[in-house]
Structures are given as structure tokens and as C-alpha cells.
């Protein structure tokens, strides 16, 4: 005696096999992220991986150029709070999350800050990835505005990672890594200004 599946079961199974992945790709956050990264990769956007916990101000511009040689860096000397030189590169994917630009800042040839501009609809996924990689953030920092936005901060061995807890309206979707030297220098300047 041979066992045969009824025709209706076969059809339902085929429908699930064909449409299940399509529905997952279209209607789940993870599926949409994977679809976005695949499309970005197909269109030639660069994918990079960067361990934010291991970043330090010991890295030089030449070392980062060598590690991320596939990126087309556009560099400019410009003195600001983050350094005296910055380089910008267009990217498509950062640690598996769709992104737009990566900006690195240098002072005296050493890395002081990294700014990642990502796609706003991937904010929660990037935040979730940071929670997994860096653990729970420290107490949110309150900004000095009438409507304070909470900024999440994670301490790393050599710096601080900052990201808004939630994006509102025209907020720029960005993540910052600041070197310990830059953070302590900024705090020292702020305390001097506060005592004047």
C-alpha cells in the first residue's frame, strides 16, 4: 500500500514553498533588510564591516585607507570639533545594515571620530545590533533643547558610541564613535566654559 498526499495538500505545500519566502522578504523587517542589502550589492554599492568596540585613536589615515581600500574617499582639511581633517566615502552596507555615508575624522593623522549615516528605516535594526554587540547602553544623555531627545551611549575600550534613541521628523539618521581623547577634551572644554 502506497501512501499518497491528497492533491489539495500538494498544492498548499507548493504555494507555501513559493510564496512563503516572498512574503517573508516583503513583510518582515529582517526580510526587507536582506532585500535592501542584496539590491545595494547588485547595484555595486560597497559593503564594509567595522568593529566599533575595537576602534581607537591609534589608527592612522593610511591604515584605514589600506583596510578600506575599496572605498573612494573624498578628503578635506577642515578644522572642527572632531579634528582637522575628514574623509567621506559613500557606502551601501555597514555591518549588514543598509547605509549611505561613512565619515572619518583625524587630528594629527590619528582617528578621532567616525560618523555613519544610515537609512532611517533601519534605525531599530542598527540599534538592536548595537545592543547585541556592545550590550546595554549607559543612562541616556539629555540634550539641551526644549524637547530633549534621548541619546544612547555605549562605552568602548577606546571611545564612546552615540546614537539617538528615536528619530523624529527631519532628524539625521547617524551614529557617532568618538575617541576617548576627543570625549575627555570635549568634557574639559565644556567644564571650563561652564565655570566662566
Language-model region placement:
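Short helix/turn-capping signatures at newly exposed starts of structured segments
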Residues: 2-139, 178-196
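A charged, solvent-exposed segment within the mature domains of Sec-exported extracytoplasmic proteins
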Residues: 129-191
